[in-house]
Amino acid sequence: MEPEPQPEPVTLLVKSPNQRHRDLELSGDRSWSVSRLKAHLSRVYPERPRPEDQRLIYSGKLLLDHQCLQDLLPKQEKRHVLHLVCNVKNPSKMPETSTKGAESTEQPDNSNQTQHPGDSSSDGLRQREVLRNLSPSGWENISRPEAVQQTFQGLGPGFSGYTTYGWLQLSWFQQIYARQYYMQYLAATAASGTFVPTPSAQEIPVVSTPAPAPIHNQFPAENQPANQNAAAQAVVNPGANQNLRMNAQGGPLVEEDDEINRDWLDWTYSAATFSVFLSILYFYSSLSRFLMVMGATVVMYLHHVGWFPFRQRPVQNFPDDGGPRDAANQDPNNNLQGGMDPEMEDPNRLPPDREVLDPEHTSPSFMSTAWLVFKTFFASLLPEGPPALAN
């Protein structure tokens, strides 16, 4: 006869997915089959599930009844975790009694509703009275479904004891909804401009003084256009900056000194670029060309700084805006008292902005053109830093 195999004890930890019961730890043998393990669980598990209703899962795999534990469980581990999934057809006694009590309470409520149809409108009042008259122990038990079922089983047939939310949560939801609706109402009222704040108890009455009567013809009509134009110019352009220039990329730029807005990184970049230019010019050119380019560069830099202003830029005489002055001298009644318009008197006279310019300004000389070409060529060789943006 073959000797019987020695039992190999193994520890199994059975877990329930729905967490209705605590984890069950039991001792078994590796020689057991899955069907024998299910039979053992039907005796020791709290709900006594039948073997046909049990499903055992290990490492994500469903265990079949004919399989053996020694073929499924590794030998290196002494403790293994199994998940038990079962369909309990006989629930505990407590839910049965609670459902029976709920059904028994619903029947008289239905009869009362048919006899007294006016009672349905007072269900909300009865709910509030029950919530208001709850004892501290009742508030503590409100988190348990059994206590909620026993407390609110007489409220009416339309309220079930097995609701998704508890009664306390439903009351909170109602308060949150009312508060949100009230805040939306206040926001809409404030946006429309019809919101009137409630007067406070410490409000002091103030007697408003009547405004003085306006003086008739206080401001003459002949001074009104000039004063209005001057005020409009002061408002539109208060303290205009003379160094302001327009930027094609958007926004104004201010003509400021480059040395103020340049940091050490800009100076390092300029020095590196200039050193590379000098090295290329020195190694790939002769000494005479190098000195000539250096001299021209120094002269260009001094001219750019302002030491050698070769040609002064002519001052542009902008035509004077005679609008306010003409408006001040104009008769408010538009009477022809000041004579006719000069343009009407002399039709051959050209306006000031269309006068013929000086021939010296219209046709540039040959020297100015040559100097402009020379300046543009050498200015393109010099590195130019980024423009300073206005804050």
Curated annotation (Swiss-Prot):
CDD domains linked: Ubl_HERP1 (cd17118)
Gene3D superfamilies: Phosphatidylinositol 3-kinase Catalytic Subunit, Chain A, domain 1 (3.10.20.90)
Any one GO MF annotation of this record: transmembrane transporter binding
Ranges of the Cytoplasmic topological domain: 1-263, 311-391
Start and end residues of each Ubiquitin-like domain: 10-72
Lumenal side: 285-289
UniProt keyword list: Acetylation, Endoplasmic reticulum, Membrane, Phosphoprotein, Transmembrane, Transmembrane helix, Unfolded protein response
Membrane association type: Multi-pass membrane protein
Residue positions where Phosphoserine is found in the record: S135
N-acetylmethionine carried by residues: M1
Residue ranges of the region described as Interaction with UBQLN1: 115-200
GO cellular component, one term: Hrd1p ubiquitin ligase complex
SMART domains (UniProt xref): UBQ
Predominant subcellular localization, coarse grouping: endoplasmic reticulum
Biased composition (Basic and acidic residues): 346-361
Subcellular location: Endoplasmic reticulum membrane
PROSITE patterns with a match to the protein in the record: UBIQUITIN_2
Superkingdom, taxonomy of origin: Eukaryota
Annotated region (Disordered), positions in chain: 90-126, 317-361
Any GO BP annotation: endoplasmic reticulum unfolded protein response
Keyword Magnesium belongs to the record: no
Transmembrane segments: 264-284, 290-310
Bias-annotated ranges (Polar residues): 95-124
Subunit and interaction comment: Interacts with PSEN1 and PSEN2. Interacts with UBXN6. Interacts with UBQLN1, UBQLN2 and UBQLN4. Component of the HRD1 complex, which comprises at least SYNV1/HRD1, FAM8A1, HERPUD1/HERP, OS9, SEL1L and UBE2J1. FAM8A1 binding to SYNV1 may promote recruitment of HERPUD1 to the HRD1 complex.
Free-text function comment from the UniProt entry: Component of the endoplasmic reticulum quality control (ERQC) system also called ER-associated degradation (ERAD) involved in ubiquitin-dependent degradation of misfolded endoplasmic reticulum proteins. Binds to ubiquilins and this interaction is required for efficient degradation of CD3D via the ERAD pathway.
Protein name: Homocysteine-responsive endoplasmic reticulum-resident ubiquitin-like domain member 1 protein
